[in-house]
């Protein structure tokens, strides 16, 4: 889970979150890779309360961000967080998926653990997680989203969508075939938090087959009790056009 928002102060009902932490290792890696870029196009899928999009908009001043957050409560908080950035950000109430259409968002008692997948073995989570009633939300594929916004290429794709990352990558078949996404920063899971959930190895195989290389694993989290077991991390993959620069 992206530390940029996981470590933010608790949010009171109806109030925007406190500003996120200073750049961590994951963001610094991206800042180094794009140090000379005058402007960036970014898609933030799983925007939660808007903290990650806020970091991109703050630390990449020339960037424009499309942020997706399907949960209505999270979306409302993200609106407040991102309001100061005006038309540099488009916040949309959408889930990123393999195809366009309506999908069921499985909600939980932890606002950062909602998923398109059913809850699995939550023993690997930090605290007890209860399943709530699902809600129907609209979904879009990345290929469709970018085409609709006139984006032929994308500099950064960030995803924190709780086990549905491989589904979303399958919905980016055209972009990935053209290696048109420069950098992909995403949460990767090593343990089955959700049913039928792909792991890091599935995602790495999918991206490696399309020419992407692993830049690194950041913010690795071990099991709270058995520290020998890796639960999740944030991974960065880069397209061939960036591999000589990273």
Where are the regions a protein language model picked out?
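Phosphate/nucleotide-binding beta-alpha loop and adjacent structural elements of enzyme active sites
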Residues: 1-246
